[in-house]
Amino acid sequence: MILRFVSKEGQFRLTVQPDSTFPELLAQIAEKLPKSVDLQSVTVSNRPQGGDARKISELKGVSFKQVGLSHGAQLFLGFEDQSTASNGHATAPTGANRLNGKVVEASDMPSVPLGSPTQVIKNPWEVVRQSPLDDKLDRQDGKIHRKRDARMCTHGPKGMCDYCMPLEPYAAAYLAEKKIKHLSFHSYLRKVNSAKNRPELGSSYIPPLTEPYYRVRPDCPSGHKPFPAGICTKCQPGAISLKPQEYRMVDHVEFASIQVVDDLINFWRNTGCQRLGFLYGRYEEYTEVPLGTKAVVETIYEPPQVNELDGISLGDWDNEKEIDEIAAQCGLQRVGVIFTDLLDADKGDGSVICKRHIDSYYLSSLEIAFAARYQAKYPRPTKWSETGKFGSNFVTCVISGDDQGQIGISSYQASNDAVEMVRADIIEPSAEPSVMLVQSEDDNEALNRARYIPEVFYRRINEHGANVQENAKPDFPVEYLFVTLTHGFPTQPNPLFTGGKFPIENREIMGEMPDVSALGKSLNAKANGLALNTTSGLNAISNFHMLCFIHNLGILSKDEESLLFKVASTHDTSEGSALQHTGGWATLLTILKESGERPPKRSYASPSFSATGRGAAHPGEKNRLMRQPSHGSDSDSVQLAKRLKGASLKGKE
């Protein structure tokens, strides 16, 4: 029979079977509506207004015959356009179901959300708000200016020729000369835009960036049943040809001070176990490469985790949103993750074993999948992509031993192909860290799910020097799935947080934890608190871990907390004076003063503690960038013995 449909876009007719259900018709309806329509919002009603409108997606199992529709019946459609949120995000679903209708248990869900489905946004350059840094780089010319060549240029001082004219930021000769391996994101954007949009052709503007999409498209216009019941060449992904990514979303990682990283390494020095932390900072322009971007790391927050000698297991992070909000009020955001992979060389000189090198691996397949999930969670909003987002600024840093036995940092990002292949569940980590496995559709029945795994290929240079294409199944090298970044420290450090030592959170395993006693000492509560109208007083409270602990106490009001975070990050004496005269600050000092200093907790020797001076500095390491703070003439083992001796004497008293 024929049904007539009326919407604000016009009228159309569809031929249906009486026993067909409403959701089965959604694909045919989508073909008649604009591409910007959110299919989950399409409603159907028997009246243009005032009728009982129902979402088609919710009418599962309801056939046209059941509701009394006959040949020639007229229905009215309503719908909304896809969300045009400022950053291109969409609300993630709160639950999920398997193909057989069984609810997916929470334990089976991925630990890190993979972001919203890819949806095309109409005129993204009008509705997407990107970061101020991206707006700034968009306005820049980006050309690489060159001086007049005295040997090759024959023109006058005001002339210009091929030897001195400005170069495009993606000029291959310049990048090779400066040994720049990857294009910056904005250089890559200029390159693809110049090829896709040519003003001389007079054609309409097309967003130059397109994110890879390796999943079966749910809104296929062919009219068949949704996958896995139906699939065609229009909705199935094509074969994937992997190649090294020529650009990177972030070019450089800058740590505000050595102490930021050294605090994380000290956990391994004291316990021998690995440690992970999230990087909080901001993004700035990086002038060492054309139109570059750098991540400036101001602090590292260590979430709840189980630490082992050879790995880390993340626990439930209950106050994750609160920490992100505190960072935001300090002008920071989460920019990446860092973790250690260190093994003492047992030489007694602080050296470590080099585990990651050209003959083993630099970033394991498991770490690439981990990085890809977080990059999917934090996409980069951009108005130059048809989906309103492209790639991610999230970086992954690894602290491990270098080829000289010293502790060094390496920075990486998973490629956009890797992120999408993880989203599509095409690849999975291997027990061999240097290779990534391609999933097999043969496992679908055992896993009670349906996946379409496209063909995956990669190109390599074979033993005869020829460039050949290889099938990636069952595994392929991980080098195709990540890009390397540079890193460093400023020559003149000017960190945002200038406070002294304060116990770092979630370190109970090594006997370190923030408490009111430590806070009272830091705020000098016995002497009625610090003078917050002085530079020294402001510097003392400028510690991110201290700010998080004060927030957890719940003593200050929201306005007082906001003022505290502002004072700690801006070091404004007038704001500090205002904070000192608030009622909440006075209450906090009174509580700390009345609580007094608690006696130190007894220290217990841990089997994982090393008595060999793990990671300690030795005379040849004075100029090392990553160094162990000096503890006088005593070694780590002597210091540990003294602490244990002092604890035992106090226990006898």
Curated annotation (Swiss-Prot):
<dbReference type="InterPro" id="IPR029071">
    <property type="entry name" value="Ubiquitin-like_domsf"/>
</dbReference>
<keyword id="KW-0472">Membrane</keyword>
<keyword id="KW-0256">Endoplasmic reticulum</keyword>
<dbReference type="GO" id="GO:0043130">
    <property type="term" value="F:ubiquitin binding"/>
</dbReference>
<feature type="domain" description="MPN">
    <location>
        <begin position="253"/>
        <end position="390"/>
    </location>
</feature>
<keyword id="KW-0963">Cytoplasm</keyword>
<dbReference type="Pfam" id="PF05020">
    <property type="entry name" value="zf-NPL4"/>
</dbReference>
<dbReference type="InterPro" id="IPR007716">
    <property type="entry name" value="NPL4_Zn-bd_put"/>
</dbReference>
<dbReference type="InterPro" id="IPR016563">
    <property type="entry name" value="Npl4"/>
</dbReference>
<comment type="function">
    <text>Involved in the import of nuclear-targeted proteins into the nucleus and the export of poly(A) RNA out of the nucleus. Has a role in the endoplasmic reticulum-associated degradation (ERAD) pathway.</text>
</comment>
<dbReference type="InterPro" id="IPR037518">
    <property type="entry name" value="MPN"/>
</dbReference>
<dbReference type="GO" id="GO:0051028">
    <property type="term" value="P:mRNA transport"/>
</dbReference>
<keyword id="KW-0509">mRNA transport</keyword>
<keyword id="KW-0539">Nucleus</keyword>
<keyword id="KW-0653">Protein transport</keyword>
<dbReference type="GO" id="GO:0015031">
    <property type="term" value="P:protein transport"/>
</dbReference>
<comment type="similarity">
    <text>Belongs to the NPL4 family.</text>
</comment>
<dbReference type="GO" id="GO:0005634">
    <property type="term" value="C:nucleus"/>
</dbReference>
<dbReference type="Pfam" id="PF05021">
    <property type="entry name" value="NPL4"/>
</dbReference>
<feature type="region of interest" description="Disordered">
    <location>
        <begin position="596"/>
        <end position="653"/>
    </location>
</feature>
<dbReference type="GO" id="GO:0031625">
    <property type="term" value="F:ubiquitin protein ligase binding"/>
</dbReference>
<protein>
    <recommendedName>
        <fullName>Nuclear protein localization protein 4</fullName>
    </recommendedName>
</protein>
<dbReference type="GO" id="GO:0031965">
    <property type="term" value="C:nuclear membrane"/>
</dbReference>
<dbReference type="GO" id="GO:0048471">
    <property type="term" value="C:perinuclear region of cytoplasm"/>
</dbReference>
<keyword id="KW-0813">Transport</keyword>
<dbReference type="GO" id="GO:0005789">
    <property type="term" value="C:endoplasmic reticulum membrane"/>
</dbReference>
<keyword id="KW-0811">Translocation</keyword>
<dbReference type="GO" id="GO:0006511">
    <property type="term" value="P:ubiquitin-dependent protein catabolic process"/>
</dbReference>
<dbReference type="InterPro" id="IPR007717">
    <property type="entry name" value="NPL4_C"/>
</dbReference>
